[in-house]
Swiss-Prot record:
Protein name: Ribosomal RNA small subunit methyltransferase A
Similarity field: Belongs to the class I-like SAM-binding methyltransferase superfamily. rRNA adenine N(6)-methyltransferase family. RsmA subfamily.
Species the sequence originates in: Marinobacter nauticus (strain ATCC 700491 / DSM 11845 / VT8)
Reaction it catalyzes: adenosine(1518)/adenosine(1519) in 16S rRNA + 4 S-adenosyl-L-methionine = N(6)-dimethyladenosine(1518)/N(6)-dimethyladenosine(1519) in 16S rRNA + 4 S-adenosyl-L-homocysteine + 4 H(+)
SMART domains on file: rADc (SM00650)
Gene name of this polypeptide: rsmA
Length: 276
């Protein structure tokens, strides 16, 4: 479906353009941009949110992969000389290069087809971030905020909560977009912890433990983590080896990872970012 700018939404970019003024206003109110903020928008699309933020903060920067959209944005916002467009893939973009005198505030209506790996990429750079506000598939927001025992609880939620406070804000129906997606959406706020509540001795070890556990989420911990820890080691930590991975909280996963870090035993490689 094309729009008044003549741009065809592209499936390969997961494009669904926000057009509902009420939803746009509510999102910007949640972000609460200030003139002095260092704000970066991922995937501005046709500039619906961009326009509202620029009116408050003319130094907004955006990261956009679709080269056909870039001239549309340049033309639309030609009267903002400090507005910067980075033609790049957000999945590999180094956001730390945009940091100047203050941490970044990152916002975006994220393409649903890359939202999970993109969030993992951004979590790895959370040290330079003040907060993040994203429009995501409702299910992804539920996974980000899930607690132990929840069916949505898994690797994404554990690692997001390791780095950030997760605050689901409100839901958005398909009618707010063109073309309308087949799923409901939701807005979430991620605020990196000033101090990690459960700092792991080795982050890669923690990531490997969590990924290994949830690759066998229906099995007991004794079976799911059999290649990494013994029943005796789990019991020494006071962890019931008969529980399933979805019953264990972040603090317990950190304790398992720290035990492995202390013993130097790790049989997994964490160079790859993957989903639950």
């Amino acid at each position: 479906m094309s729009n008044k700018h003549g741009h065809q939404a592209r499936k390969r970019f997961g494009q669904n353009f926000l057009h509902d003024p009420g939803v746009i206003e509510r999102i910007v109110r949640a972000i609460n941009p200030k003139p002095e903020d260092s704000i970066v928008e991922i995937g501005p699309g046709l500039g619906a949110i961009t326009e509202e933020i620029l009116a408050i903060n003319p130094r907004l920067q955006v990261v956009e992969l679709d080269r056909d959209l870039i001239p549309v944005l340049r033309t639309k916002f030609f009267n903002y000389p400090e507005f910067r467009i980075h033609e790049a893939d957000a999945l590999s973009f180094d956001f730390s290069q945009l940091v100047s005198d203050r941490p970044l505030r990152i916002v975006g209506n994220l393409p649903y087809n890359i939202s999970t790996p993109l969030i993992f990429h951004l979590l790895s750079q959370s040290g330079v971030v003040q907060d993040m506000h994203f429009m995501l598939q409702k299910e992804v927001v539920q996974r980000l905020a899930a607690v132990p025992g929840d069916n949505n609880y898994g690797r994404l939620g554990i690692m997001a909560q390791y780095f950030c406070k997760v605050q689901p804000l409100f839901e958005v129906g398909p009618g707010a977009f063109r073309p309308a997606p087949k799923v409901d959406s939701a807005i979430v706020r991620l605020v990196p912890h000033k101090e990690l509540p459960y700092p792991a001795k080795d982050l890669k070890t923690l990531q490997a433990v969590v990924r290994t556990a949830f690759n066998a989420r229906r099995k007991t911990l004794r079976k799911a983590l059999a290649a990494m820890v013994t029943v005796e080691q789990l019991q020494s930590l006071g962890i019931n080896d008969g529980l399933r991975p979805e019953n264990l909280g972040l603090a317990d996963y950190v304790r398992i990872a720290d035990l492995l870090a202390d013993t130097g035993k790790l049989q997994a490689d964490d160079n790859e970012v993957s989903d639950d």
